From Swiss-Prot:
It comes from Desulfotalea psychrophila (strain LSv54 / DSM 12343). One of its GO terms (molecular function) is proton-transporting ATP synthase activity, rotational mechanism. F(1)F(0) ATP synthase produces ATP from ADP in the presence of a proton or sodium gradient. F-type ATPases consist of two structural domains, F(1) containing the extramembraneous catalytic core and F(0) containing the membrane proton channel, linked together by a central stalk and a peripheral stalk. During catalysis, ATP synthesis in the catalytic domain of F(1) is coupled via a rotary mechanism of the central stalk subunits to proton translocation. The keyword Transmembrane applies. F-type ATPases have 2 components, F(1) - the catalytic core - and F(0) - the membrane proton channel. F(1) has five subunits: alpha(3), beta(3), gamma(1), delta(1), epsilon(1). F(0) has three main subunits: a(1), b(2) and c(10-14). The alpha and beta chains form an alternating ring which encloses part of the gamma chain. F(1) is attached to F(0) by a central stalk formed by the gamma and epsilon chains, while a peripheral stalk is formed by the delta and b chains. This is ATP synthase subunit b. The chain crosses the membrane at residues 8-28, 87-107. The gene is atpF. CDD domains: ATP-synt_Fo_b. Signal peptide: none annotated.
Amino acid sequence: MKENIKRVLPFLLVLLFAFAPLALASAPVDAPAPADAPADALPSAKVISAPADAGVIEAVELEHATVTGAHDVAVAHVADSLSHEKLMDLFWRVLNFAVLMAILIKFGAKPIANALSGRQQRVKSEVEDLEARRIVAEKEFRQFEAKLANVEKDIDSIVDKAVAQAEIEKAKILERAEQAAADIQKSAEQAIQNEIANAKRSLKNDAADQAAVMAEELIVKHLTADDQVKIVEDYLAKVGAV
C-alpha cells in the first residue's frame, strides 16, 4: 500500500498544485477602489490661506494629503476583503479540496496503482515475449544459415556426382556403340560371305545343269540307233540283275 501511495503521490501533488490556485482565485474579492476616489472618501485636505508667494508649499501639502488618503482607502479595502466570512469560505474550500484528495488517495490510489502496475507488467511481459521471439528468430536464422551452407555443399556434391555419372554413362554408351558397330560389321561380313557362298553354289548348280544339258545335247546329237539299242539292253540287264 505504501508503495502504491508513493507511486500515486506525485500525481496527487500535481493535482493539488493545479487546483489550489483555482480554488483561491474563485473566492469573491471586491474590486479595488479607483485611483481617482471621490472627494468624500478621502480626508479633507487642509486648505491653508496664504499669500501668492506660498503657492508651492500649498500644492505640496495638498498632494501629500491626497496620497495619504488613497493609502488609507486601500488598507481599509484589503482589511474588508479578508473578513471572517471570506476566510471561512476559503477555509471550507481548502478543506473540501483536502477531503477530495484524501478520498482519491483512499479509494483511487490502489486502482490507479494496480492499473499502472498491470500496465507495467504487461509492458514487461510484452518486452520479454519480444525478446524471447528475437532469440528464437536469431536461433532459427542461424539454423537456416547452417542448412543453407549444407545445401550448397550438397549441391556441389550432387553436381560432382552427376558429372562423374555422366562420364561413366558416356563411356558405357561409347562402348555399346562400338560393340554395336562391330556386331553390325561382323553381321555384314557374314551376310556378304553367305551371299558369296550362295552365289557360288548357284553358279555351280547352273554350270552343272548347263553341262548336263550340253552333254545331253551332244549325246543325242551323236547317238545312233545301235547305240540306243545297246543302252536299252544294258538298262534291262541291270534291272534284271537287281
